[in-house]
Every structure is written in structure tokens, then in C-alpha cells.
A protein has these predicted regions:
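Walker B catalytic acidic pair
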Residues: 78
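Active-site-proximal or metal-binding-adjacent scaffold patches in catalytic folds
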Residues: 1-73, 82-118
């Protein structure tokens, strides 16, 4: 049985992670400040977009996510992108050296599969 993704569930997953290391030290926005959307993309399991007006959006695909574990891993991946954006660590390369360093820290703490961050 697969879980049914909703924007509310995405926000709850975000808030859960945001209260754990290392996210709780990253000064990320509260969940209510982020727009969460469920997509049906077969190509992208998730994506983060930061806008010039300071707003944020995280989208997660229901076609890629069937378990709570996978949802949490993909949300954590997008939260690394969010952290890079808010800390001004982004480059033209979506996954730069800083991303992989932060992702390794998240995977080590939460015992996530590093392939979810590739």
C-alpha cells in the first residue's frame, strides 16, 4: 500500500525533519512559510524553487513516492537545496560540492541512502 501524498503531509514531513539535526541548526523557514505541492512527475521525485521575493516552494511527486521513508528522504534532499538557497551557497550546478557535503551529513545522521541525494 502506498501513502497518499497531500500538501499537508508534505508540510508535516518538512516540520518533522526541521526539528532534527542538522536541519534544526540551519535556520530554515517554518513549514507554513513554504508552498508545498504534489506533482505526478515521473522524471523528478522532488524539486525546490526559491523565488526572488523570498518565497519558497517544494514539490514532491506521487509517482515516485510510495512509502513514508522515501518521502522523508526526498524531503530531506529538497531541504538541503533550501538551506543552500537561504545561506546563499547555490551555484549554477544544482548539486555542487557544498550540496554533497551537506547531504553526506544528513545521510550520516539519519541513516539515509546517499543515492537519494545523487
Amino acid at each position: 500500500m502506498t501513502i497518499k501524498l497531500t500538501p499537508e503531509l508534505l508540510e508535516w514531513a518538512y516540520e518533522l525533519l526541521n526539528h532534527t539535526e542538522p536541519f534544526d541548526n540551519w535556520n530554515l523557514p517554518d513549514g507554513h512559510e513554504i508552498k508545498f505541492e504534489v506533482t505526478k512527475s515521473a522524471k523528478d521525485c522532488g524539486d525546490y524553487t526559491g523565488y526572488t521575493d523570498g518565497t519558497h516552494r517544494i514539490r514532491i511527486s506521487s509517482r515516485c513516492i510510495g512509502t513514508l521513508q522515501k518521502l522523508i528522504e526526498i524531503m530531506a534532499h529538497e531541504m538541503v537545496h533550501l538551506h543552500q538557497a537561504t545561506a546563499r551557497m547555490e551555484t549554477k550546478s544544482q548539486h555542487n560540492a557544498a550540496f554533497y557535503k551537506l547531504a553526506a551529513q544528513v545521510c550520516r545522521i539519519h541513516k539515509f541512502d546517499p543515492k537519494a541525494f545523487a
